[in-house]
Amino acid sequence: PADVEFLSFDDELNGALEGFDVAINAGDAGTAYSGGKCWNNPDLEAKVREWVYNGGGLIGVGEPSAYLKNGRYFVLSDVFGVDKELGFTLSTDKYNLEKVSGHFILEDAKAPLDYGEGMKSIYAKPDTSVLDICGQDVFMAVNDYGKGRAFYMAGLPYNIQNERILYRACHYVAHKEKLLKRWYCDDTAGTGEYYPQS
């Protein structure tokens, strides 16, 4: 159970994130979903960084905050803990290739994980926890940023397992892991409904 609201980047600039536990930025570079040129606004960057740093949870799918600027492809790469290699830093070794096992988000996931078309050439920053990787391409990662957390996933086509992964990721980045099983089905093919007013 979650209350969902769609925010514009103007809403975010006006402080709308303050009323939320989790924000999702998902999509391919240059699309309205990812944000495109909106990420060329330092005020937007600062608002989102501040919100996460103070305890907000940020989820990125595909190419979140993608706008080539200041030597980074993901403007919020420091928050997500990942960035996309475009050839500018090929001479720099990326050593964070070790997969963390037993993470809360993947606790009941079964292989293979489905990223759809996914993303290639995503690499993790040194302190990022890599949850799934193939070769040198990071497909899933989490990162602490101040009091907040961020989660990155290379793609998120709809299926039962990805629904559960997203649900668990929302709880994780919001620091609400203990509330996960308040209304929860052990079988990922089932859903539970709760009507507190009835």
Locate predicted features.
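A glycine-rich, often tryptophan-bearing local segment used as a flexible ligand/cofactor-contacting loop or short
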Residues: 30, 35-110
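Short catalytic/ligand-binding loop motif for oxyanion handling, primarily in non-cytosolic enzymes
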Residues: 15, 32-33, 66-72, 139, ...
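Aromatic-Pro/Gly-enriched surface loop or interdomain linker
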Residues: 1-22, 185-194
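Alpha-helical scaffolding within the catalytic cores
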Residues: 7-13, 43-46, 135-139
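Structural motif
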Residues: 21-31, 59, 150-152
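Short, well-ordered alpha-helix to beta-strand connector turns
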Residues: 19-22, 55, 127-128
